[in-house]
Amino acid sequence: MKGLIDISPALRVGMGVFPGDADFAVSQTFTIGPDCPVNVASFAMSTHCGAHVDAPLHYDPLGASIDMLDLGDFIGPARVIDARGKDPLCGFEEIASALDGAPPRLLLKLMDRGDQLTWPTGFRALAPETVERLALRGVRLIGVDVPSVDPETSKSLPSHMVCRRHDVRIVENLVLADVIPGDYELIALPLKLRGLDAAPVRAVLRRLGSQ
């Protein structure tokens, strides 16, 4: 559709997943042939495969599940910010100049990631102080183009914990490589999976002023 930018990776067999998590898998239930008029496939995947929203339940045993979240958080004005850098954690000062007049949804381009099939070992994440200061500025949703807002090896998940305290929504594994920094409308609705800790999204951006 005119004006839409797809920022979701294709879900496919062989794509990178968090170490130890379930692989994306597909099986064929029915195949078109002399005795069958249709193709029907089934698939299995982790709730954190591809572009997805983390529910508070993911990092808080008493947190809300994905079906309980307000959908309004995932639709509305958003700003894409180039937050690439050499340090393993993105500091607030690196993006501060891009925040003037920013809407409550921020999408951060943290690394050059062209191949979504390959797991991005050592990916750049967010310093918890960065998340804290963004939340205090009124940011309600943070999206990143890496698998997690915390480093791959983190066990304490400090940036997730800041999001928990401030009730900030998290969208991970977006495709932002070719998106020009600036302001857009974000549409990233998570699937309504009752009682689960996360859900995949088909996230898109709409250029402001487009129909």
Which role fits each region the language model picked out?
Residues M1-Q211:
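Active-/binding-site microenvironments in catalytic and ligand-binding cores
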